[in-house]
Structure formats: structure tokens, C-alpha cells
Amino acid sequence: AVVDAVTGTGFHGQFRANARLAAQQINRAQGFVLALDVPSGIEADTGRAAEDAVRASLTVTFHAKKPCHRLARQHCGEVRVARIGI
């Protein structure tokens, strides 16, 4: 299994070089990919995907779903909300 936490909810645009390499390696990994909050390379508010955005098997998001969980469904996989007391 791979845990994706390269970028977060503040991501916009395209990856920088090292982040792109990390996302490419995650996408090449065999097996389960868990994204924390938002898959890397996905804009939380718009669902826009950067080139090489991570494709997760499961996304665990915190407090509530974000627009990208609906708009970029193909990158998020199953989405579960973790209640964190906010």
C-alpha cells in the first residue's frame, strides 16, 4: 500500500518537478493507494487535475467532503469522511 500526502487542499495548477516525480511513482505502484484529504494534484475547490495527478483507491478526507470528491471522482476512488471534532 502507498499513502499519498504529497500535496493538500491548497494545491493549484501543476506540480513542481519533485512532486510530479512522486505522483508518477505513486501512480506506477502496484496495489492500494490511500490519499489523505485530497489526492495529490487535484484542486480541492474545482476538481481540476494536474498532469500526473494521483489516482487513489481510497481517499480519507477530514470533517466534510470537498467539491473535488464529486468533480474528480475518477482520482478519488472511494471517499470516506473522518470526523475530527470541528
Which stretches of residues belong to each language-model region?
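YjeF_N-associated NAD(P)HX repair module
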Residues: A1-I86
